[in-house]
Amino acid sequence: MKIMLKPLMFSLLFIVVFTSCKNNNDGPDVSSVKINLTTKRFEKDFFAIDTNNIIPQINKLATEYPRFSDNFLTTILGIDSKWPPDTTAYYLKGFIAYNRSVYDSAEKIFANFSPYEKDIKKGLQHVKYYFPAYKIPNNIITYIGPADGYGDILDENVLIVGLHAHLGKDFPLYKTSAVAETYPQYITERFTPEYIAVNCMKNIVLDLYPENTEDKRLIIQMIEKGKRLYLLRKFLPGIEEYKLAGF
């Protein structure tokens, strides 16, 4: 269960954080803050599927990734649970074939995911430092999805990283019309590995402090965005300012 802070509680915490923290680009010493974090590479298991025996192997994945597997199929890929098995198998075969080159590129770029896990873990240590009651995700799941679809997601107890959204700003797929219609160039400029931790922490910030969609006044929206950006700075001290913008 996610911990959602009430606006008043958050305002008080915000004041405490704002007035008590030193202006230090390196942030506080969080080395003693214990975070258990495990990364699972869903895309490796998914693209290793024998497409001649796809349904039984998808069912096996469902036991290994019980919550994410269902979300991946229905929400990310858009598969209707009412489809006949043959239709689902045909759709999945097409997705795997079309995205094989994307997976191959991700395998090269993210052969070692440890540096990104380390950055995420450090960010989570800062979250725990400032908000000790917040339930910190202790899992990372990486995946490959449609390039014009979801990217990085926060789910219950897990940070979900869409590697297809971090292959480098000049990756050919991002230049296609299908992707450009969803993600214009100013967004795909940030489709690089260095934004993985940033996006994960942005999702944490939005979980702590959801957007206020009721008050549309510009000044209120500016204040709201400023608060979220301030928190992001605290969670990722030392990160260049241009990487943190974009709320």
Predicted feature descriptions by range:
Residues V17-S20:
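C-terminal motif of bacterial Sec signal peptides marking the signal peptidase cleavage site
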Residues M1-M9:
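Bacterial N-terminal signal peptides that target proteins for export
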Residues L8-L12, S32:
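Alpha-helical interaction segments
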Residues K22-L92:
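N-terminal mature-domain "stem" immediately C-terminal to a signal peptide or N-terminal signal-anchor/transmembrane
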Residues L12-L13, A178:
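Glycine- and acidic-residue-rich phosphate-binding/metal-coordinating active-site segment common to enzymes
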Residues Y91-F247:
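Acidic/His-rich structured neighborhood in mature extracellular/periplasmic domains
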